[in-house]
Amino acid sequence: MTPEPGDGSAARRAFAAAAGSRLFILLVGFVTAAAIGLGDPPWTLIFPRHAAPFDGVLGWLFDPWGHWDGVWLIKIAVAGYAESDGSTAFFPLYPLLLRYVGVLFGGNLLLTGLAISVACYGGAMVLLYRLVREQYDARTAALTVTLISFVPTSLFFQAVYTESLFLLLSLACFIWARKGSWKLAGLAALLATLTRSTGVLLIVPMAVCYYEQRDWSWRRTDQHVVNLLLVPLGLLMWMTYLSLAFGRPLLFAAAQEEWRRSFAAPTVAVGRALAAAVLGAAQLLSGQNLTLYWPVPKPSSAFGMAEHNLVSLAFFLLAAGLLYYGYRRLPPSDWSYFL
């Protein structure tokens, strides 16, 4: 990467957009919570003492970011895993960070999670900017950071979710792999696998980077290839814990059934998504409550699910189109990471 005039201003614009997006989303959450409330989740049943949400104005500001997965991650950080409640579907690194970093925040794990997610998001944006800038100009790098900061789903980057941590670790893995720092890349991939099950897929871009740097020659394989095994090691560590604690090394996979999820080939998953989207369109056009995979709790929620399925299909098709576009223009290592 050769410095060019305007690099500094482009970087400042990128990070101003990243910071501004966090403040904007925080403000939207605050206004929404103040206007319509937060609902009535069983906070007192799940959040332990000193980890409870805030009250009043502070509650409107911070509590929206601890819902859904956040509640489970906080519960695990305090009470640990159980065999039959589906908690083992959540991998352990984020709850461990909550538990031990929480000491710095007086044990308030909601605030701890917000701090962890925002810090990881900031680090990820720095890495993303540098990654893009190595191959393109500063304007493209700044635009990339701006787009990912303002995409609607970027709200999860500051919630008590694993998205920011996983993005940071996966980017670090890929950047180090591109530079040939295989031990660091393997360590980052191991930690990513301890964050989310999809981390194990980082072995693909790592392997592509490895052999791309060796002109695709198997004969040039050296001792550094061993570091690729650090990727599945994270999964093996998690399975070992589950085996010792519950006698079920694959409990994390069985727990997916609690969330109505299962493993399937990509073609099967896409086929199911298309069927759900078609049924969703039929529901919205006909006004009828139709059931495909499981009944919804109340008729009105069927139409919300239909809208969700259609939006998900639209984003899937957009992503597929971008992947095809990238396949024709990006190096194999870059494309494999984006895949």
Ranges and model annotations:
Residues 64-107:
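Short hydrophobic/aromatic helix or loop-helix immediately within or flanking a transmembrane segment
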